[in-house]
């Protein structure tokens, strides 16, 4: 009988950890030039894919390495995103129990940060990786307020017009067909809903390309922010897209 898959607690090997840190440093360094030089942007994407393959983020032991080593690095960013989510809903006079969907939630850190600020919200995190959601499952609540689902971002098990806010961080550059994901976001959003999509600018397509894809899917890009100062140094490599559902 196969042993049930579970997050490993064994530390990463020293040499492997050093190589991973070098790859991350190289990606961030290239980010300074990526916005200006298109070949550098392509090289950075290739390096990021190499990092994903090296870490094996979507299977064990890579998921455990990500949850224990990489996810905490983005803690300050997640807190800033959670504040954005709360502010966005408050500015729209949202009901007390909004439904929030986190696409590509990984080990669930952002879901937890949002739940601390919106105590009555219903928050669902989805991810294509079962091993990532083994980590996220630690945060599941018995009342169903927080739960996680294994599924593709382009095939979300939600009814039409049932979600108040969609959020995604560090996931868009993994989408093989962004148009399909944006179409799914447009489908599940309520007519007055909003999506906040964050990704590393050096890994994603140009802002104009993404805006065009979103518009074709039935979403209206209302704001594009290249820097998020309150998220710390790392956040300066991010782009945030605010997309609204069409009434």
Q: What are the residue ranges of the model-derived segments?
A:
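A short glycine-rich, Lys/Arg-flanked "PGG" loop and its adjoining helix->strand segment in the class I
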Residues: 179-191
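Conserved class I S-adenosyl-L-methionine
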Residues: 41-93, 109, 113
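A short acidic, Gly/Pro-enriched loop at the edge of an enzyme's catalytic core
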Residues: 154-165
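Class I SAM-dependent methyltransferase SAM/SAH-binding core
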Residues: 101-103, 107-155
């Amino acid at each position: 009988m196969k042993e049930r898959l579970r997050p490993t607690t064994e530390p990463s090997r020293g040499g492997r950890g050093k190589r991973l840190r070098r790859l991350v440093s190289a990606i961030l360094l290239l980010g300074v030039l990526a916005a200006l030089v298109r070949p550098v942007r392509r090289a950075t994407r290739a390096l990021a894919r190499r990092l994903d393959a090296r870490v094996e983020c979507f299977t064990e032991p890579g998921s455990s390495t990500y949850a224990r080593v990489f996810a905490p690095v983005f803690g300050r960013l997640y807190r800033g995103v959670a504040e954005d989510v709360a502010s966005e809903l408050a500015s729209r006079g949202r009901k007390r129990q909004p439904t929030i969907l986190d696409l590509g939630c990984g080990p669930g850190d952002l879901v937890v940060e949002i739940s601390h600020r919106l105590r009555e919200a219903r928050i669902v995190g989805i991810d294509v990786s079962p091993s990532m959601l083994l980590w996220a499952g630690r945060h599941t609540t018995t009342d169903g307020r927080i739960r996680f689902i294994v599924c593709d971002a382009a095939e979300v098990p939600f009814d039409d017009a049932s979600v108040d806010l969609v959020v995604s961080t560090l996931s868009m550059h993994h989408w093989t067909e962004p148009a399909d994901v944006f179409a799914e976001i447009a489908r599940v959003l309520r007519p007055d809903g909003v999506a906040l999509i964050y990704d590393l600018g050096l890994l994603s397509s140009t802002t104009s390309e993404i805006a065009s894809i979103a518009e074709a899917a039935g979403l209206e890009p209302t704001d594009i922010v290249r820097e998020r100062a309150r998220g710390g140094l790392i956040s300066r490599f991010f782009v945030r897209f605010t997309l609204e559902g069409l009434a």
